[in-house]
């Protein structure tokens, strides 16, 4: 994980440098660094960087103790994968931690068409061609697979292939690539149970309303460790040749990303 984290920061910082407008200076060691004039950046609120994410804010993407208005974790802590990425980008753009403002943006709202209240959103949002028609994405900061979570001791827990998943009721959050994977690849005989939030989908599995939950792999680890007792990751699904990856989301045409 440490090597992956280093790579993600490199990708995030490379994106940030692109938004700086090219101002640079040479150090005594002969290396060139990029600096930003915050006044030249196209920001929602002058003088501060506004970052959106959903609430609750879950590990491993966010850390720190719960603090209002945030539930479970606190994006402002700088702890957790996505919080650290956001602050690394902010630092490269010339913002101190105190100049970063976090706002609550529901998952499906983040990549919907129209004006945005954030400069960028970080919330495990996978790049898809359809989404890229209405919002802009940064380069990948995390490559991901989809996974399936089941309760131990259930019939579906013995499944060993995608074909064996077809008879079961699968739960998933609406608007996600997890939902798209179910439709395009698993193609179950029963309509999947679709929920507005991942919390609701998790609760359905926990309460026995669904047989399994499809989510991205890091989320699956959190679900099995902290949310659904006596559950396990049944397996992870292979991705397409191009793979699935998360990117920072921007309003379409935002000059911060190009």
Model region roles, listed by residue range:
Residues 31-121:
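Extracytoplasmic small-molecule ligand-binding "clamshell" domains
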Residues 142-150, 218, 225-258:
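Periplasmic-binding protein-like
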Residues 109, 125-134, 183-184, 206, ...:
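A ligand-binding cleft/hinge motif common to bilobed small-molecule-binding domains
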Residues 85-87, 92, 154, 169, ...:
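Extended ligand-binding regions for polar small-molecule ligands
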Residues 1-18:
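Sec-dependent bacterial lipoprotein signal peptides
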Residues 17-31:
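Bacterial lipoprotein signal-peptidase II cleavage site
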Residues 98-164:
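Acidic, polar ligand-binding/catalytic clefts
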Residues 89, 113-115, 165, 204-206, ...:
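Hydrophobic residues within well-ordered alpha-helices
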């Amino acid at each position: 994980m440490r090597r992956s984290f280093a790579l993600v920061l490199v990708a995030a910082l490379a994106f940030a440098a692109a938004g700086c407008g090219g101002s640079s200076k040479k150090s005594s060691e002969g290396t060139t660094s990029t600096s930003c004039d915050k006044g030249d950046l196209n920001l929602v609120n002058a003088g501060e960087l506004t970052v959106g994410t959903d609430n609750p804010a879950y590990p491993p993407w966010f850390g720190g103790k719960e603090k209002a208005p945030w539930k479970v974790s606190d994006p402002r802590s700088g702890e957790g994968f996505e919080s650290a990425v956001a602050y690394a980008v902010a630092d490269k753009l010339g913002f101190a931690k105190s100049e970063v403002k976090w706002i609550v943006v529901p998952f499906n709202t983040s990549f919907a068409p129209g004006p945005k209240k954030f400069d960028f959103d970080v919330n495990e949002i996978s790049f898809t061609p359809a989404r890229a028609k209405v919002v802009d994405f940064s380069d990948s900061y995390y490559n991901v697979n989809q996974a399936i979570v089941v309760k131990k001791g259930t019939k579906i827990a013995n499944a060993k292939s995608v074909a064996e998943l077809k008879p079961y009721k699968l739960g998933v959050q609406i608007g996600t690539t997890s939902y798209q994977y179910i439709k395009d690849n698993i193609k179950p005989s029963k309509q999947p149970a679709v929920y507005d939030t991942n919390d609701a989908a998790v609760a359905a599995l926990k309460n026995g309303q669904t047989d399994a939950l499809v989510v991205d792999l890091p989320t699956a680890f959190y679900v099995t460790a902290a949310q659904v007792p006596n559950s396990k990751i049944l397996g992870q699904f292979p991705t397409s040749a191009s793979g699935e990856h998360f990117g920072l989301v921007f309003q379409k045409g935002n000059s911060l990303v190009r």
